[in-house]
């Protein structure tokens, strides 16, 4: 399970150091794809295969095909180099607006990669709103 928030910098070649707490759980090879809300999703291979199976089992309608294209066209196989970095392809950097400061966010079975600016604008500052969402989904402490 992935959790936590880690700030890093992306270099001029599009490489980012993966937080050490995430490296073991990611494994040697994993998938980076377009995410929702302007971020990237990073899946360990096992989780990615599970997600792909769900995409395969969608009906053949237009909406399902759009979802399949969205996630599969943006997907890239990645691996961590000897310095603990991953190379984010240009199209994915552009999708997420990654240019310098980035944030890794652990979200259960996947990792999200955000530009720091987008992350800060999407973060919840309103605790009442969070409490309302928790109640709406039946969550309690």
From Swiss-Prot:
Residues forming coiled coils: none
PROSITE patterns, A to Z: SPOVT_ABRB
Keyword terms: Cytoplasm, DNA-binding, Repeat, Transcription, Transcription regulation
Compartment annotation: Cytoplasm, Nucleoid
Keyword Glycoprotein: no
Pfam families named among the record's database cross-references: MraZ (PF02381)
GO MF annotation list: DNA-binding transcription factor activity; transcription cis-regulatory region binding
A biological process from GO: negative regulation of DNA-templated transcription initiation
UniProt-listed SUPFAM superfamilies: AbrB/MazE/MraZ-like
Listed GO CC annotations: cytoplasm; nucleoid
Domain of life: Bacteria
Domain SpoVT-AbrB, residue spans: 5-47, 75-118
Entry annotated with the keyword DNA-binding: yes
HAMAP family: MraZ (MF_01008)
Quaternary structure (record): Forms oligomers.
Family as reported in the entry's similarity comment: Belongs to the MraZ family.
Descriptive protein name: Transcriptional regulator MraZ
Gene: mraZ
């Amino acid at each position: 399970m992935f959790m936590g928030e880690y700030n890093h910098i992306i270099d001029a070649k599009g490489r980012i150091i993966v937080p050490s707490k995430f490296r073991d759980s990611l494994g040697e090879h994993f998938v980076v794809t377009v995410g929702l809300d302007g971020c990237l999703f990073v899946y360990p291979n096992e989780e990615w295969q599970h997600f792909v199976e769900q995409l395969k089992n969608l009906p053949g309608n237009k909406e399902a095909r759009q979802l399949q294209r969205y996630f599969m066209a943006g997907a890239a196989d990645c691996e961590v180099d000897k310095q603990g970095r991953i190379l984010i392809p240009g199209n994915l950097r552009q999708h997420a607006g990654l240019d310098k400061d980035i944030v890794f966010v652990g979200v259960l079975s996947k990792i999200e990669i955000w530009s720091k600016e987008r992350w800060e604008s999407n973060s919840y500052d309103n605790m009442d709103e969070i409490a309302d969402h928790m109640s709406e989904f039946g969550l309690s402490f």
